[in-house]
C-alpha cells in the first residue's frame, strides 16, 4: 500500500495490537512516545527482559490499562526480538513466541517510520480493527482491495495471529466476499496458497 500511496485508503486487520501500532504511528504525540519506549527496549534488551515484556499480556486487567504507545512499542519490540519475527498468540490471546537469541536488537528505522507517519497523517487513511467483511461493506466499483489472510495449508494448522484463528470457514467466507466484490466492479487481489479449498 505504501508503494502505491493512495490519498484515501482503509487499513484493516483482525490483529488489534498491529492496528494499534498503525494508530500510534499516525498520532504525533503517541508516535514520539512510542519511539522513546522503543529506545528503552533496545537499551534494556536481554532474554530476561524479553520475557518480562512478552508476559505483560498475562494480566489482562493490567495490560488493558497500558498506554497505547507502550503497547505499540511492545508489539514492535517483540516482533524484532522474538524467534524468526513470528507473530503468534495462544487461545487466551497471549503472545507466545520464544526469545530469538539476539544479543542486540534494532527495533526501528526512524527514517522509515517518519515516512510512514507522514503518509498516514497527510492522507485520508482509516485504520480499522474489524472483521474483513465489515471493512469492505462500503466498497464501490473501481475500488482496489487487497486481502492478505493467513494462508490456507493442507500441512500446517498454524493460523494463530489472533485468539480466534482463521480457519477453513473463514477462508470460504473470504472467497465468497472476494467474488461479490469482483462482481461489483472492484479490483480485488488476494495472497494465499494454491489451495483446493477455495
Where do the model's predicted regions map?
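Conserved S-adenosyl-L-methionine
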Residues: 1-42
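Short loop/helix-cap segments at secondary-structure boundaries that form the rim of catalytic
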Residues: 2-5, 137-139, 198
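Short active-site oxyanion
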Residues: 7-8, 122-125, 182-188
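A residue-level signal for conserved active-site and pocket-lining positions in enzyme catalytic cores
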Residues: 22, 76, 188
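SAM-dependent nucleic-acid methyltransferase catalytic core
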Residues: 27-146, 150-159, 173, 179, ...
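Short glycine-enriched, charge-decorated loop/helix-capping segments at active-site entrances
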Residues: 160-165
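Charged helix-capping and loop-helix junction motifs
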Residues: 167-169
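Conserved Class I SAM-dependent methyltransferase catalytic core
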Residues: 171-198
Amino acid at each position: 500500500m505504501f508503494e502505491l500511496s493512495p490519498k484515501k485508503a482503509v487499513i484493516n486487520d483482525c490483529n488489534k495490537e498491529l492496528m494499534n501500532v498503525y494508530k500510534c504511528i499516525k498520532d504525533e504525540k503517541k508516535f514520539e512516545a512510542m519511539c522513546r519506549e522503543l529506545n528503552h527496549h533496545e537499551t534494556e534488551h536481554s532474554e530476561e527482559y524479553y520475557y518480562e515484556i512478552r508476559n505483560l499480556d498475562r494480566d489482562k486487567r493490567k495490560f488493558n490499562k497500558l498506554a497505547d504507545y507502550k503497547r505499540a512499542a511492545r508489539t514492535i519490540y517483540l516482533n524484532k526480538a522474538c524467534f524468526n519475527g513470528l507473530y503468534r498468540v495462544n487461545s487466551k490471546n497471549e503472545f507466545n513466541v520464544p526469545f530469538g537469541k539476539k544479543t542486540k536488537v534494532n527495533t526501528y528505522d526512524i527514517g522509515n517510520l517518519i515516512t510512514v507517519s507522514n503518509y498516514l497523517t497527510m492522507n485520508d487513511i482509516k485504520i480499522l480493527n474489524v472483521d474483513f467483511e465489515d471493512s469492505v461493506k462500503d466498497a464501490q466499483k473501481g475500488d482496489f482491495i487487497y486481502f492478505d489472510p493467513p494462508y490456507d495449508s493442507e500441512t500446517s494448522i498454524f493460523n494463530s495471529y489472533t485468539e480466534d484463528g482463521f480457519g477453513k470457514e473463514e477462508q470460504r467466507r473470504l472467497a465468497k466476499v472476494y467474488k461479490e466484490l469482483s462482481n461489483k466492479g472492484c479490483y480485488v487481489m488476494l495472497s494465499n496458497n494454491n489451495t483446493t479449498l477455495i
